[in-house]
Amino acid sequence: MSNKVHLGHTARKRFGQNFLTDGNIINRIVGAISPDDDHVMVEIGPGLAALTEPVAMGIKNLTVIELDRDLAERLKVHPTLKDKLTIHQGDAMKFDFSQLVEPERKLKVFGNLPYNISTPLMFHLFEFAEHIENMHFMLQKEVVLRLSASPGTKAYGKLTVMAQYYCQVVPVLEVPPGCFTPPPKVDSAVVRLVPYAEKPWPCHDVEMLRKVCNTAFNMRRKTLRNNLKPLLQDADFDVLGIDAGLRPEDISVAQYVAMANYLCEKR
């Protein structure tokens, strides 16, 4: 039997499907998620229910969002899960997560995300950060390193800045390829993202912050002076107290927010 087949389902490359099969890793992830009925529990991409079953066992209801129509149909007739699941068959990238919020109950979101859409999907979820208590995601290890990076390191980039603007980022555990069917070609890791109730560095306009990050990191080896020339001059850097001779990876999240706010005030 092909190593792409698990529980009678063939993994689909176009959906980026790799099914988690290691029981010890599954238990550790469920422990980190800490399912409860005080929050609306939401799983993105339940697949063949490796996380769905143990999470649903201890709670009254679990909402799942599954793009693959065949897998959504399997869940609808699952002998132990069908009465516990609220199933949305569709694209999580287009899903309005605010519709799931209930009075006094924020969302806890988790999933083994398809690696080919993990970054844009996280950016989509950041738009609903005020409604989310925390998120636990299986991602490429490289992406988790970028999310949790510190200034001055090679992994630090625009994804780091935007993620850490919205959330506390905590790596949870590493997961080798052999824990999946089929095994991915890269190492994986689980990360916890906890949206700030009050952002430590409030930004006037998140789109401006995104623009500053995109422009600054466009050419990593060049200085801020070169990369941000369309937006900021030396006199502006002097006002901000930022050394224009530094490279983009040397600048903190707070400093990126300060640049974005300064540009908003200059408009």
Swiss-Prot record:
Pfam families with a match to the protein in the record: RrnaAD
GO cellular component: cytosol
Subcellular location(s) per record: Cytoplasm
EC number: 2.1.1.182
Reactions catalysed according to its record: adenosine(1518)/adenosine(1519) in 16S rRNA + 4 S-adenosyl-L-methionine = N(6)-dimethyladenosine(1518)/N(6)-dimethyladenosine(1519) in 16S rRNA + 4 S-adenosyl-L-homocysteine + 4 H(+)
Top EC category: transferase
Major subcellular location class: cytoplasm
UniProt keyword terms in alphabetical order: Cytoplasm, Methyltransferase, RNA-binding, rRNA processing, S-adenosyl-L-methionine, Transferase
Domain of life: Bacteria
MF (Gene Ontology): 16S rRNA (adenine(1518)-N(6)/adenine(1519)-N(6))-dimethyltransferase activity; RNA binding
Record-listed S-adenosyl-L-methionine binding positions: 18, 20, 45, 66, 91, 112
SUPFAM superfamilies on file: S-adenosyl-L-methionine-dependent methyltransferases (SSF53335)
Function: Specifically dimethylates two adjacent adenosines (A1518 and A1519) in the loop of a conserved hairpin near the 3'-end of 16S rRNA in the 30S particle. May play a critical role in biogenesis of 30S subunits.
Family statement: Belongs to the class I-like SAM-binding methyltransferase superfamily. rRNA adenine N(6)-methyltransferase family. RsmA subfamily.
Protein name (database record): Ribosomal RNA small subunit methyltransferase A
Species this chain originates from: Shewanella amazonensis (strain ATCC BAA-1098 / SB2B)
Gene this protein is translated from: rsmA
